[in-house]
Amino acid sequence: TAAIIPAFNEAESLPNVISEIKGLFPDHLIIVVDDGSTDGTADIAKEFGCVCLSMPFNLGIGGALRLGFRYCMDRGIDCAYQFDADGQHDPTQISSLLSELEHSDMAVGSRFATDCSYEVGQSRKAAMNFLRFLVRIYTGQRFTDTSSGFRAFRNPVIKLFAKEYPVEYMDSVEALLIASKNGFKISEIPVKMRERSAGQPSNRNFRLIYYFL
């Protein structure tokens, strides 16, 4: 089992993220994909004994994830999970996400699967609702969180994404479309998010909609 952590200038938050995963899952392979960072993110990953894959420049989360999937495919990794480097994902929920792979090919940790305390602004909420609507049209499946960065994958999906994972801004949404188109079963489980430990959040959902349209 491997953790794929795309990281761009996350030197401040990465040490705690790695330490938490190692503490809970000492047998998991941790792969940090340094996406052209300039703050020493790669050095920290190496210091903590992680596999560090370095991009020559910033390609975005999609490009970083594809590299991580290729690494897993080449080494025959059975299952992998995507985990953010900013500290917002709770590693105690990794087991639940991986357990979902017992009857699914891909599992998504949803912030909105049940009534929860995770709040977003009205404009961002509207963007998320629109993305959910578009994905439902294309897949016929109702997803509550199309932009979640907390996901798990079985080996067949890893192999698919190693070759076809989208590298543009809409990677999280398009990944759902690609997996669904290829007949893979995708499921969601509710997860809780934590406050970002460092850095600044992005307007990712608005860029996703712009690219999609």
Regions found by a protein language model. Give the residues of each.
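Cell-envelope/extracellular polymer assembly enzymes that use nucleotide-activated donors
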Residues: 1-2, 29, 174
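A conserved acidic beta->alpha catalytic loop
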Residues: 34-42, 87
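Acceptor/aglycone-binding surface of glycosyltransferases and processive sugar-polymer synthases
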Residues: 51, 55-57, 61-74, 79, ...
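Catalytic donor-sugar/metal-binding loop of nucleotide-sugar-dependent glycosyltransferases
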Residues: 142, 164-167, 176-194
